[in-house]
A protein has these predicted regions:
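The DNA-contacting recognition helix of HTH DNA-binding domains
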Residues: 3, 29-30
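Short helix-boundary/capping micro-motifs
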Residues: 11-26
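Residues within the DNA-recognition helix of helix-turn-helix
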Residues: 28, 35-38
Length: 72
C-alpha cells in the first residue's frame, strides 16, 4: 500500500466517481482503476462494487476509510 493508493481510495469514496478522481488527479480513468485494483490486491479485499448509480463502497471499505481518514 502506498500514498497514491490511499489518496485515490479517499477521493473515490468522497466523489463516488472514477471519472472525477481522474480529472482531479490529472490521471486517466484506466490509471485510477489500475491503482484501485492494485490496492485491493495489496490489502486482500474489494473496496468498491459497481451498480446503476456508479461505485458503491463495500462495508470493508467504509471501515478502512475511517482508518485512512485518521491519517490525513
Amino acid at each position: 500500500m502506498n500514498f497514491l493508493q490511499l489518496e485515490v481510495f479517499r477521493e473515490t469514496i468522497c466523489t463516488g466517481s472514477i471519472k472525477r478522481v481522474a480529472e482531479q488527479m490529472n490521471l486517466s480513468e484506466r490509471g485510477i482503476v489500475d491503482v484501485i485494483n492494485d490496492h485491493e490486491r495489496d490489502i486482500g479485499f474489494s473496496l468498491f462494487t459497481q451498480n446503476d448509480k456508479g461505485l458503491e463502497p463495500t462495508s470493508e471499505a467504509h471501515r478502512f476509510y475511517k482508518t485512512v481518514e485518521n491519517k490525513f
